[in-house]
Amino acid sequence: MADIKLIALDLDGTLLTTDKRLTDRTKATLKAARDRGIKVVLTTGRPLKAMDFFLHELGTDGQDDEYTITFNGGLVQKNTGEILDKTVFSYDDVARLYEETEKLSLPLDAISEGTVYQIQSDQESLYAKFNPALTFVPVDFADLSSQMTYNKCVTAFAQEPLDAAIQKISPELFDQYEIFKSREMLLEWSPKNVHKATGLAKLISHLGIDQSQVMACGDEANDLSMIEWAGLGVAMQNAVPEVKAVANVVTPMTNDEEAVAWAIEEYVLKEN
């Protein structure tokens, strides 16, 4: 078996079932890994505030020696909330993205820690339906300021018009920012070189763990970087094709069939 010291887990479509549950088998498997001293790190696009329930389910909430990577790698923090590393947008970045989404007739939400600033637009954002635990504040763009922290931006919109609009994004923006879909109806905008792999690289440097000792599990485009980077990259059976293409392992089952539990049992817990 690989000498895995850290397991990085995406949430939606990976660790969680479609109805957003952690099954008993999955929780037991993660506990068995933690009992062996293996770090279990939720690695997500969400802010820490939206993770409280799941960290509580895992028994790692509020712990000084447990860690979470949020905002797709933009924030590396202890589960106490203490920040180890942070990369954010400038106000000018948000202004440029707002200009682009207005041109494409798309909504844009700017996220500042646990608060989502929903910039008023002709198109309604669907982001509140994805993360009801967050605080949503409707604003005009003029209400935003350079004194605010902007962790990332999102565009949550109906899949068909969103996919069509993505094809029209100004090409230079792909050189300036990280732009990727994390769900069918969710496009994420992050600072350049902020993705899950960079967040994990910063965390393992802090912990003294080698890249080869990391197992990463995911299913969507925002998981691709960490699955390609990790010593053991695991794609769910339900993963998008580009993620499966870079994975070391593709599970024979989906997230609804406890694929993460299977992968940990097979590649971490199983005795030789």
Question: Whereabouts are the PLM-identified features?
Answer:
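Short, structured coil segments at secondary-structure junctions
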Residues: L58, D64, N72, E172-D175, ...
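Structural detector of well-ordered beta-strand residues that form the stable sheet scaffold
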Residues: V41, I69, D109, F180, ...
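Active-site phosphate-binding/coordination module
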Residues: D24-E124
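Conserved acidic, metal-coordinating active-site core of Asp-based
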Residues: E100, L104-C217
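Residue-level signal for inorganic ion chemistry
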Residues: A33, N72, C153, I227, ...
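Mg2+-dependent phosphoryl-transfer enzymes with acidic/Ser/Thr/Gly-rich catalytic loops
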Residues: A2-L6, T23, E188-N272
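Short, hinge-like loop/turn segments at secondary-structure boundaries
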Residues: E57-D61, D85-T87, S125-K129, K196-T198, ...
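Asp-based phosphoryl-transfer active-site loop
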Residues: D3-T18
